C-alpha cells in the first residue's frame, strides 16, 4: 500500500518540496542559523520602529520616555524586552553562523566570504554606534 502523500497530486507536490527534498547529507541543524538571523533582524526592525514611535532622545526626558513605554504603552515592556533580548539573540546567531562557515570551510569561496565579513563589520559598527556610544 502506497502512502497518500506520494499518490495524491497536491500532496505529492508538497511532499517533493518539503518532505523528500533532495539535500546534501551534511545539511544539519547548523544551517538554520542563517534563517534565524533573518527572523531576528525582522524582529529587531519591527520592535525598533514601534519603540521609536514613543522614545524621546532629549537628555532631560529620555528616562521618562522609557518609563512611559514600559508603563503606559500597551505591551510596551514586551517590545522593550524583545528588542533588547533580540539583539543578543541576533549576535549569538551571527557568531554561530560565522562559526559554521569556518567549520565547513566556506572561507574557500573568497568572494562570498569577504562580502559576509564586510556585513559582519557593518553590523558590529552599527551596534557600536547605536547601543554602546549613547
UniProtKB/Swiss-Prot annotation:
GO terms for molecular function: metal ion binding; ubiquinol-cytochrome-c reductase activity. Binds 2 heme b groups non-covalently. Keywords: Electron transport, Heme, Iron, Membrane, Metal-binding, Mitochondrion, Mitochondrion inner membrane, Respiratory chain, Transmembrane, Transmembrane helix, Transport, Ubiquinone. Heme b b562 binds at residue 83. It holds the Pfam family Cytochrome_B. Heme b b566 binds at residue 97. One of its GO terms (biological process) is mitochondrial electron transport, ubiquinol to cytochrome c. Its main location: mitochondrion. GO terms for cellular component: mitochondrial inner membrane. The keyword Mitochondrion applies. It is found in: Mitochondrion inner membrane. InterPro entries: Cyt_b/b6_N, Cytb/b6-like_sf, Cytochrome_b_N_euk/bac, Di-haem_cyt_TM. It is a multi-pass membrane protein. Coiled coil: none annotated. The chain crosses the membrane at residues 33-53, 77-98, 113-133. Its cofactor is heme b. Belongs to the cytochrome b family. Heme 1 (or BL or b562) is low-potential and absorbs at about 562 nm, and heme 2 (or BH or b566) is high-potential and absorbs at about 566 nm. The cytochrome bc1 complex contains 11 subunits: 3 respiratory subunits (MT-CYB, CYC1 and UQCRFS1), 2 core proteins (UQCRC1 and UQCRC2) and 6 low-molecular weight proteins (UQCRH/QCR6, UQCRB/QCR7, UQCRQ/QCR8, UQCR10/QCR9, UQCR11/QCR10 and a cleavage product of UQCRFS1). This cytochrome bc1 complex then forms a dimer. Component of the ubiquinol-cytochrome c reductase complex (complex III or cytochrome b-c1 complex) that is part of the mitochondrial respiratory chain. The b-c1 complex mediates electron transfer from ubiquinol to cytochrome c. Contributes to the generation of a proton gradient across the mitochondrial membrane that is then used for ATP synthesis. This is Cytochrome b. The lineage of its organism: Eukaryota, Metazoa, Chordata, Craniata, Vertebrata.
